Amino acid sequence: MNENIKQNYLNHPKGIMSWLLTLDHKRIGLMYLFSGILFFFLGGLLALVMRFELAAPGNDIISNEVYNNVYTLHGAIMIFLFIIPAIPGALGNILLPLMVGAKDVAFPRLNLASFYIYSFGALFAMYTIINGGVDTGWTFYTPYSTQSSSNVVPMTLGIFIIGFSSILTGLNFIATIHKMRIPGLTWYKLPLSLIHI
């Protein structure tokens, strides 16, 4: 490749390592998007299991304990692994620098690190599926979570790790909006869609 051509998300080197070690905001946004789609389908599959159980009276596809586990995992996956981190992570990483006229986010390494923190927290939370599940409901309210199995702790820790990743991503977006806007783009001229990200 010609050395005068600047690398962007279209002409990166090929291979899995170029994706895993990228600092390009669009590629990181695509990684958030693909992981969000994966968790969306996993949560949707759990919703289908619940719907099949409730389709007809007396229809016992799964037991009551397994239903409570599926209910909790569906809610936790859809809220904490899809809606909260994946949508702002995907849309924000792809669109936010383009909307403010920046070439990249303010801290590209922090951007990649927050994706890996999100992935680590998601794996930690998914460990509970293999280890027997959680049956407290996705809100993890105290009476149920204190009387439940020991799987509440890894699920809660995974959610805290995912929340930390979302905080780092949000701080990166705030720094990008504040410091990397093009000249003339004042606070009152910012696109309104930046506020929802």
Give residue ranges: language-model regions.
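Transmembrane alpha-helix/helix-exit interface in multi-pass inner-membrane proteins
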Residues: 40, 44-51
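Membrane-interface helix-loop-helix modules in multi-pass inner-membrane proteins
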Residues: 51-174, 181-184
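Conserved small/polar residues in nucleotide/adenosyl-binding loops
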Residues: 195-197
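Hydrophobic alpha-helical transmembrane segments in multi-pass membrane proteins
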Residues: 32, 36-42
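Short, Lys/Arg-rich, polar N-terminal cytosolic tail immediately upstream
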Residues: 1-17
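Juxtamembrane inter-helical linkers in multi-pass membrane proteins
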Residues: 183-191
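Cytosolic juxtamembrane amphipathic/interface segments immediately preceding
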Residues: 12-28, 103, 181-182
